[in-house]
Structures are given as C-alpha cells and as structure tokens.
Regions:
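FAD-binding core/adjacent interface of flavoenzyme oxidoreductases
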Residues: 1-8, 76-143, 251-255, 259
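A conserved FAD-binding loop/helix module that cradles the flavin
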Residues: 157, 267-311
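FAD-site-proximal beta/loop scaffold in flavoenzymes
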Residues: 117, 123-139, 229-278, 286, ...
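A Rossmann-like FAD-binding core segment of flavoenzymes
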Residues: 66-87, 93-94, 100-102, 163-250, ...
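Glycine/Thr-rich phosphate-binding loops of Rossmann-like dinucleotide-binding domains
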Residues: 41, 115-116, 155-156, 222, ...
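Conserved FAD-binding catalytic core of PHBH/FMO-like flavoproteins
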Residues: 125, 130-164, 169
Length: 327
C-alpha cells in the first residue's frame, strides 16, 4: 500500500475503534488494521457497556463501532501485522499481505486470556467460561460456580463471588495451592470448598456448562467457570520497535498513552489499564486526542497547516498601516 498515512491503528477492538472514530472526526488520514481476532468478538453478551440496557453481543458491538468509524472516512484493512520499524521520520509496518507507512502508530492489540487446562473448555468462552468478575459476575447470581486457580487471586475471586452466589467451589485442577496463610484462613472462615483433583472432562450444551468430571471419578453439576490462569498481552510489536514493557509484559505509557518511543502510542488491554471494554474505549479516545494534538503541533512547527482563505491584506502583501479594516 503506497503513501504515508497520518495515523495507523493496529488492532480492531474497542480501543482501536474508539481511536479511529476520534481521529476520523479530526479529519486525520487514518487506517485501522485488524486481524479479526479481538477478544470482544467472543463475548456472547456484554451487559456493562453504557447505552445498551439489554446487553449486546461483543461481535455486534465491534460491527457497530467499525461502521461508525468508516462513516468518518477511516479506512479499515484486515491483515496480520508482523513488525513495526522506524524508517526515517515515519514508521514502516509490515503485514502478512501488505506493507504500510505512517507518521504516528497506535498499538491497540489487546491480550489473550489463558483458558484452564480442561478438555473442551474453549467452546464455553463467553457463555459459561469467564475471565472477569467485574464483567460477568452479576449475570451469574445464585448459580453454581467453580473458580479454577491456586493462588491468592483465585481465593480473592472465590470470596468476591460470595456477593453474588453462595454456591462457590475453588478447584486446584491437580495443582498445589500457593495462597498464603491469610487466604487459607479466609477460605476456612467462609467455608468455601476446595477440590484438589484434576478436572478430566466437562459436559456442555452449546457452550453452556452442565457438569465437570474430576479425576476421582466424581461428577459435579456446575453452571459457570472463572479462571485466574492469567493473560498474555500482545506487546511483541511494541518490543520490536523498542518500547518499554512492565513486569507483566504490558506496554508502559504515560497519561497521554505515549510509549517510550516518540510517535508510538498504545491503548487498551495491552497497557496496564484495568482491562474493561468501556475503559479500553476511553483509552482509545485519549490516545486519539493526544495523537491529533501531536500532529497539529508538528504542523505548526513545520508551517504546514492549511491556509485561511480570509488572510489579512498585510498577509497578501498590502501596506500595513496598523489598522484593521472590515468589508
């Protein structure tokens, strides 16, 4: 693809789409490149996104966001970006299908939630396998929940779920517990059962969990799983161009979402922000405003802003007598 864009956004989730919308409305030449694999796509129903009181499927939310951005002349391309490099004063982006160049780049590639080691569990993602208590606990009130994990975070999840249901089990899935003494005491105090044996199989109907089968041969009826196995931020592109990461592998940004590389920005779940769709969208807007301001200031420095049609007579070369005249 020829020509240097003002902005290229890598990632088509909520952060990328929100940034695209703002940049399009700022009349910036913007290209959004996405791989079609946003985690939001797999959410069967998003209930905590403002403006959708009846909920909305994650895929529908992405489709609406794309349609809205395209209205403001944002171009969208489906490609898998393989590398980002600095080339002079611009960035060179190599995709699997095409190459691209831009003055500014926003990385909004998100992360991948790691599913638990349970056969067949991936078919339950977004329907009865969940990764975020703040996102999904409300819909599971009174249901039978199993939290799969072995650390303090897993215990915190189990304790937090007691606000929504008393039917909570903590499953180690064949691993050794690593939580501290305080957390062990809370498990005992609140009488949360802990199962250590591995989960060998699950039964579901179109992604809706029905039963779990444990290594000892017992089966337990369950309605949903939460896992605290962890996440993998998609930050490799930022590393390749020299951006700094934190200890969790997330891209370090400042309050304007600037990375340690001038001209390179990051937003959404690939940064240390709380990974929520509405927060990602807000970060996308912040990054877009920062990028727009950055480009504006560069235009001022280089004297490349569009010229006014109503320039003063002195600007046209007429004598300047110090008076302002109106016609």
């Amino acid at each position: 693809m020829t020509g240097v864009r003002e902005v290229i956004i890598i990632g088509g989730g909520l952060a990328g789409l929100s940034a695209a919308l703002y940049l399009g409305r700022s009349r910036r030449d913007t290209l959004l490149i996405h791989s079609g694999r946003s985690m939001a796509k797999w959410e069967a129903e998003v209930q905590n996104y403002l403006g959708f009181p009846d909920g909305i499927a994650g895929a529908d939310l992405l489709d609406r966001g794309t349609e809205q951005a395209v209205r403001f002349k944002v171009e969208v391309a489906e490609d898998e970006v393989q590398s980002v490099m600095i080339k002079g004063e611009t960035f060179h982006i190599q995709g699997r299908q095409c190459s691209y160049d831009a003055k500014r780049v926003l990385i909004a590639t998100g992360l991948t939630h790691l599913p638990p080691d349970v056969p067949g569990v991936k078919e339950c993602v977004g329907k009865s396998l969940f990764f975020c208590k703040d996102c999904d606990a409300y819909r599971l009130q009174g249901q039978r929940l199993v939290i799969i994990g072995r650390n303090n975070e897993a215990v915190d999840y189990a304790l937090g779920m007691l606000l929504f249901t008393s039917r909570v089990t903590l499953a180690l899935n064949g691993k050794e517990a690593s939580w501290d003494q305080d957390h062990a005491g809370w498990l005992e105090e609140y009488q949360i059962p802990v199962r250590q044996d591995a989960i060998l199989a699950l039964e579901h109907e179109e992604g809706r969990l029905r039963t779990l089968t444990f290594a000892r041969g017992e089966s337990a009826q369950m309605d949903a799983i939460f896992t605290t196995r962890g996440d993998v931020p998609h930050s490799a592109l930022a590393v390749g161009v020299g951006a700094l990461l934190d200890a969790e592998g997330q891209i370090i940004v400042d309050e304007r979402l600037r990375t340690s590389v001038p001209g390179l920005y990051a937003a959404g779940c690939v940064t240390p922000a709380n990974c929520q769709m509405i927060i990602a969208a807000g970060q996308g807007a912040i990054a877009a405003q920062a990028i727009n301001r950055d480009l504006f200031e560069e235009s001022l420095r280089r004297h490349t802003l569009p010229r006014s049609e109503n320039r003063s007579s002195s600007a046209r070369g007429a004598p300047d007598d110090g008076e302002t005249r109106f016609s």
